[in-house]
Amino acid sequence: MPNWGQVMFQDAASSVMLQLVSFHDHALLVLTLVLTVVGYALLALMLNKQVNRYIMEAQTVETIWTILPALILLVLALPSLRILYITDEVSQPSITVKTIGHQWYWSYEYTDFLNVEMDSYMLPTSDLLPGDYRLLEVDNRMVVPMQLEIRMLITAADVIHSWTVPALGVKVDAVPGRLNQIGFTTTQPGVFYGQCSEICGANHSFMPIAVEAINTKSFMSWVSNFKP
């Protein structure tokens, strides 16, 4: 969960989010180096009292400021493409969860099990218990086994939604008539909250997401005792 006044990411709870945080630090380092060099160049030119009005070309400088930005973009693009490939490529998922966005709630279908499907609505303030989070708690959480690869198949029944859980590093558009796929693996038990991140109508702010990660034994027990 984010804290009041927090300026950085939430604690990473998936392998993908750990890599996203690492890539953020990598990109920020490159950005700092670029700003330092540009700032130094500007300051040096402003303080330089020597003026040459007859410079018509500078092949060496033009070569440097063409090749150097290309190399910097390459340094940023390669790790970014790697993470993008990892999130889209789901090789051996343990379970598949089909997620459907509605105005204004989510539906979850566990396709590997019979009749394990549910709708997930936001809990009104009057139903909250002490310690619950306002506008984030739901009546039915999406339960997943931790440390196992989960495949999400995401679509929508009406308008475009976006299924987003920051701690897991997951953000996928739910588009009517289209099935999007993403994979993630939770690294620790807990409850991770998110919200629809695509404006979808009057109650867009009131369709939260709650993902509960538990151990495999508890998950199988939950499936066995599940009542639609």
From Swiss-Prot:
GO biological process, one term: ATP synthesis coupled electron transport
Predominant location: mitochondrion
TM helices/strands, residue ranges: 27-47, 61-81
Reaction(s) catalysed (UniProt annotation): 4 Fe(II)-[cytochrome c] + O2 + 8 H(+)(in) = 4 Fe(III)-[cytochrome c] + 2 H2O + 4 H(+)(out)
Keyword annotations: Copper, Electron transport, Magnesium, Membrane, Metal-binding, Mitochondrion, Mitochondrion inner membrane, Respiratory chain, Translocase, Transmembrane, Transmembrane helix, Transport
Membrane topology: Multi-pass membrane protein
Binding residues annotated for Cu cation A2, in chain numbering: C196, E198, C200, H204
Binding site for Cu cation A1: H161, C196, C200, M207
Record's keyword annotation contains Transmembrane helix: yes
SUPFAM superfamilies: Cupredoxins, Cytochrome c oxidase subunit II-like, transmembrane region
CC annotations in GO: mitochondrial inner membrane
InterPro entries: CcO_II (IPR045187), CcO_II-like_C (IPR002429), CcO_II_C (IPR034210), Copper_CuA (IPR001505), Cupredoxin (IPR008972), Cyt_c_oxidase_su2 (IPR014222), Cyt_c_oxidase_su2_TM_dom (IPR011759), Cyt_c_oxidase_su2_TM_sf (IPR036257)
Cofactor(s) in the UniProt record: Cu cation
Compartmental location: Mitochondrion inner membrane
Domain of life: Eukaryota
Record has Cytoplasm as a keyword: no
Cofactor note: Binds a dinuclear copper A center per subunit.
One GO MF term: copper ion binding
The protein's enzyme class: translocase
EC number of the protein: 7.1.1.9
Complex and partners: Component of the cytochrome c oxidase (complex IV, CIV), a multisubunit enzyme composed of a catalytic core of 3 subunits and several supernumerary subunits. The complex exists as a monomer or a dimer and forms supercomplexes (SCs) in the inner mitochondrial membrane with ubiquinol-cytochrome c oxidoreductase (cytochrome b-c1 complex, complex III, CIII).
Function: Component of the cytochrome c oxidase, the last enzyme in the mitochondrial electron transport chain which drives oxidative phosphorylation. The respiratory chain contains 3 multisubunit complexes succinate dehydrogenase (complex II, CII), ubiquinol-cytochrome c oxidoreductase (cytochrome b-c1 complex, complex III, CIII) and cytochrome c oxidase (complex IV, CIV), that cooperate to transfer electrons derived from NADH and succinate to molecular oxygen, creating an electrochemical gradient over the inner membrane that drives transmembrane transport and the ATP synthase.
Protein name: Cytochrome c oxidase subunit 2
